């Protein structure tokens, strides 16, 4: 079976690099175009990335000799789908241009997330939200990831919401520096320090999960009906977002019921046996000092959400710690899993 031709937009950035790594020898998709800024256009990817590749494995052989172009659908006419790791300053218009040209977009940027016709897709959590794509007027459809911080949080909340109902959630994030992209946070700001503010993060963390965890009725996504309060902090960890979560339930569960709901959780990616689908989706660790980025980040090749430290909360009901890989499960990996789901469900033609 021939593979679907795809492009990577923002190919030189941190998320773009993850796309290129994860798409190497992919059974469904063939990367035929790499797109970046005018500064890189006209050069081969290997030439541009000689000193800029920041992933421990080597640049995949398929990518080295591809000539970079600017992100213009006229230059990538043969592709069916584009993965976007573009900066939000340019992503909105560029992604819309691709959709207008009939090329599907799976975006990691914030620009289209709150459009009522665009799903914030988390493949195990809300595959039913794909129904709203028919409301988009363009031939090419736009699908987005959530913010990387709340990806693991949303996965942790989904089975709890379904079984016990949720009234309110408090989040306290400790976000890795790779989440700021490259070159990222200045060394003098982050070494030996915690920065208690990340522009726009708290607003996204308080609203995106409600859309992601909502239900589709009459072709529209109805947001979940609980409240979220978030504190977001940048910490001197390279990869991995750790979030402390406290939850007030409509029907308070026991510790055993919560753990059981996490261990039993799976979704369409697991049922369909998608290449990047983690098994388990959630791993609960009993050790009192886990999860830790250094020890747990690569669980399930970076796609498994790791949870620990479940204990009673004296103000709400229960509290726990959730860890997810921000550039894999929270970005490129989630987007690729979404694309695999679209492929298997024949949304890509």
UniProtKB/Swiss-Prot annotation:
Record-annotated active site: 148, 241
GO biological process, one term: lysine biosynthetic process via diaminopimelate
Binding of NADP(+), residues: 12-15, 39-40, 178-179, 326-327
GO molecular function: aspartate-semialdehyde dehydrogenase activity; NAD binding; NADP binding; protein dimerization activity
Domain of life: Bacteria
Pathway membership, UniProt: Amino-acid biosynthesis; L-lysine biosynthesis via DAP pathway; (S)-tetrahydrodipicolinate from L-aspartate: step 2/4; Amino-acid biosynthesis; L-methionine biosynthesis via de novo pathway; L-homoserine from L-aspartate: step 2/3; Amino-acid biosynthesis; L-threonine biosynthesis; L-threonine from L-aspartate: step 2/5
Alphabetical keyword list: Amino-acid biosynthesis, Diaminopimelate biosynthesis, Lysine biosynthesis, Methionine biosynthesis, NADP, Oxidoreductase, Threonine biosynthesis
Positions that bind phosphate: 113, 204
Reactions accelerated catalytically: L-aspartate 4-semialdehyde + phosphate + NADP(+) = 4-phospho-L-aspartate + NADPH + H(+)
Annotated residues for binding of substrate: 175, 201, 234
EC category: oxidoreductase
Entry's EC annotation: 1.2.1.11
Stored SMART domains: Semialdhyde_dh
Matches recorded under InterPro entries: ASADH-related, Asp-semialdehyde_DH_CS, Asp_semi-ald_DH_pep-lack, Asp_semialdehyde_DH, NAD(P)-bd_dom_sf, Semialdehyde_DH_NAD-bd, Semialdhyde_DH_dimer_dom
Family indicated by similarity: Belongs to the aspartate-semialdehyde dehydrogenase family.
Described purpose of this protein according to its UniProt entry: Catalyzes the NADPH-dependent formation of L-aspartate-semialdehyde (L-ASA) by the reductive dephosphorylation of L-aspartyl-4-phosphate.
HAMAP family: ASADH
Quaternary structure note: Homodimer.
Protein name in the entry: Aspartate-semialdehyde dehydrogenase
Organism encoding this protein: Leptospira interrogans serogroup Icterohaemorrhagiae serovar Lai (strain 56601)
Organism classification: Bacteria, Pseudomonadati, Spirochaetota, Spirochaetia, Leptospirales
Gene: asd
């Amino acid at each position: 079976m021939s593979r679907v031709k795809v492009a990577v937009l923002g190919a030189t950035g941190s998320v773009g690099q993850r796309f290129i790594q994860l798409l190497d020898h992919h059974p469904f998709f063939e990367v035929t175009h790499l797109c970046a800024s005018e500064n890189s256009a006209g050069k081969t990817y290997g030439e541009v990335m000689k000193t800029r590749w920041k992933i421990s494995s080597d640049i995949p052989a398929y990518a080295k000799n591809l000539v970079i172009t600017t992100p213009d659908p006229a230059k990538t006419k043969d592709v069916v789908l584009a993965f976007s790791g573009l900066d939000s300053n340019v992503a909105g218009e560029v992604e819309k241009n691709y959709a207008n040209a009939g090329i599907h977009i799976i975006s990691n940027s914030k620009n289209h997330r709150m459009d009522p016709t665009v799903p914030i897709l988390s493949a195990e959590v809300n595959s039913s939200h794909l129904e709203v794509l028919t409301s988009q007027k363009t031939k090419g459809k736009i699908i987005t990831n959530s913010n990387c911080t709340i990806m693991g949080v949303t996965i942790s909340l989904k089975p709890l919401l379904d079984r016990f109902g949720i009234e309110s959630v408090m989040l306290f994030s400790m976000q890795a520096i790779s989440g700021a992209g490259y070159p990222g946070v200045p060394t003098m700001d982050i070494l030996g320090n915690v920065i208690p503010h990340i522009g726009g993060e708290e607003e996204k963390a308080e609203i995106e999960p409600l859309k992601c965890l909502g239900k589709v009725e009459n072709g529209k996504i109805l947001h979940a009906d609980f409240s979220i309060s978030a504190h977001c902090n940048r910490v001197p960890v390279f990869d991995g977002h750790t979030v402390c979560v406290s939850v007030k339930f409509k029907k308070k569960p026991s510790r055993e019921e919560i753990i059981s709901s996490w261990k039993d959780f799976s979704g369409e990616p697991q049922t369909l046996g998608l290449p990047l689908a983690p098994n388990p989706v959630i791993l609960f660790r009993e050790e009192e000092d886990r999860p830790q980025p250094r020890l747990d980040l690569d669980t399930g090749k970076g796609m498994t959400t790791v949870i620990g430290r479940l204990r009673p909360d004296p103000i709400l009901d229960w509290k726990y710690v959730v860890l997810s890989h921000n550039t894999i499960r929270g970005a490129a990996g989630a987007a690729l899993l979404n694309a695999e789901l679209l492929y298997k469900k024949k949304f890509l033609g």
